[in-house]
């Protein structure tokens, strides 16, 4: 058990310069930058594998478009699903990314769109690109959840103050659900995908495994995470929007994983990624 120290979300300020500023640099943005940088390093190393259809010269563009898709999709998805009333009251709120508020599922759709377009550009199948990208997205997910923790947002439900996992927030003992998600969606997801993709795998299999592992981790953490205030529980007094969006990911992931390995078994010299 420990007491949450209420971090200052602003890491440092620059300026004012030439009458503008000061420019506030927030931990939330820094964490995303660190996540993308680590993903870039890992992806460049992986691209050097002899079987990889994605070459090192593609990695810079891929990371740029992943970041663009994740940020735009994540922010738009969050505001449409969780903060629509806020957008109606203040349309400019959608651009205030530094204040927090990113939806994984929106960001996921943004990345899918960006990688589909980039795959067409380099003339590679969609799942070849996504299989390459999947393990390295875990760095961004981990960094984003640490950013949530620093911002003091997305806390878990109350728990016993005597519990070893309890974090005291404003006098209440709570689950640090952001750290649970950082572990499951970051550390566990990366290790599973990295170990699995260290040798050639059937096209689509790594992407499918991403859907399964992320979906299961998110679904489980939702049981101890406070539901979004705007939505509350959707059904049965415990079903959350996060679970509703994660369940299809798990189902689709299982189907794609089976299909990928079945095709590899049936087709000699089937494509690998």
Annotate each predicted stretch with a short phrase:
Residues 1-273:
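A feature for loop-to-transmembrane-helix boundaries and adjacent hydrophobic helices
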């Amino acid at each position: 058990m420990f007491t949450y120290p209420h971090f200052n979300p602003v890491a440092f300020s620059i300026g004012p310069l030439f009458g503008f500023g000061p420019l506030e640099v927030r931990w939330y943005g820094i964490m995303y930058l660190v996540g993308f940088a680590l993903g870039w390093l890992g992806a460049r190393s992986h691209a050097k594998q002899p079987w990889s259809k994605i070459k090192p010269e593609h990695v810079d563009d891929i990371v740029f478009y992943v970041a663009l898709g994740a940020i735009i999709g994540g922010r738009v998805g969050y505001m449409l699903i969780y903060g629509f009333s806020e957008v109606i009251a203040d349309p400019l709120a959608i651009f205030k990314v530094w204040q927090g508020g990113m939806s994984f599922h929106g960001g996921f759709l943004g990345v899918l769109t960006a990688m589909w377009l980039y795959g067409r550009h380099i003339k590679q199948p969609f799942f070849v690109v996504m299989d390459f990208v999947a393990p390295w997205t875990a760095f961004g997910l981990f960094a984003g959840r640490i950013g949530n923790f620093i911002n003091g947002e997305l806390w878990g439900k109350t728990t016993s103050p005597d519990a070893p996992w309890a974090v005291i927030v404003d006098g209440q003992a709570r689950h640090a659900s952001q750290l649970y998600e950082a572990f499951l969606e970051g550390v566990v997801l990366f290790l599973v995908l990295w170990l699995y993709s260290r040798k050639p795998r059937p096209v689509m299999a790594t992407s499918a495994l991403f859907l399964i592992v992320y979906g299961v981790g998110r679904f489980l953490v939702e049981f101890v995470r406070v539901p979004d205030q705007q939505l509350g529980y959707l059904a049965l007094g415990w079903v959350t929007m996060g679970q509703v969006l994660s369940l299809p990911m798990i189902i689709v992931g299982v189907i794609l994983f089976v299909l990928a390995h079945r095709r590899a078994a049936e087709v000699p010299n089937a494509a690998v990624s």
